[in-house]
Amino acid sequence: MPDQLNSRVETCYQQAEAFFKRTFKRPVVSFQLRGQKAGVAHLHENLLRFNPQLYKENAEDFLRQTVPHEVAHLIAHQLFGGSIQPHGEEWQLIMRGVYELPPNRCHTYAVKRRSVIRYIYRCPCPDSDFPFTAQRHGMVRKGRRYLCRRCREPLVFSGETRTE
């Protein structure tokens, strides 16, 4: 899986070098990205991070659009410095001029939402389910208290969880 992507990164750099007639420092490429982002360019670290799940599900478009998109950020930074806008004129110039691609800001890949566990808290009021996030549940375990707005009694963990 990473071989094709690494090869595409190298091809993008070679295209940029031919276009600008200069060399560019190659980045470190990582597959340590999760969530909704397909890729991230870390300008000061000269690092590209890619989402392996989105790559696997959208390989063709990922190689055609996402990889040049992220490489263009690093090229723009090396050419124009840190005072440019992330998807500004300079980046767009590279997308259109070097890669002959539309300068799309965001991908349209289907992103699966992960299931979320809710911890059910209750008070004496009838029908008083309060679904807490894992973070809020953790705060209660550390001693934080939450009160019902109706009866002003503390909310107590019922022992139940719900997956959404």
UniProtKB/Swiss-Prot annotation:
GO molecular function: zinc ion binding
Organism whose genome encodes this protein: Pseudomonas syringae pv. syringae (strain B728a)
Key words of the record: Cytoplasm, Metal-binding, Zinc
Binding site residues for Zn(2+): H69, H73
Residue ranges occupied by any SprT-like domain in the UniProt entry: 13-156
Protein family per UniProt: Belongs to the SprT family.
Essential cofactor(s): Zn(2+)
Compartment list: Cytoplasm
Cofactor note: Binds 1 zinc ion.
Active site: E70
ATP-binding listed as a keyword: no
SMART domains referenced in this protein's UniProt entry, alphabetically: SprT
Keyword Zinc: yes
InterPro entries xrefs: SprT-like_domain, Uncharacterised_SprT
Top-level taxon in the UniProt lineage: Bacteria
Gene responsible for this protein: sprT
Single biological process term from Gene Ontology: response to stress
Protein name: Protein SprT
One protein family per Pfam: SprT-like
GO cellular component entries: cytoplasm
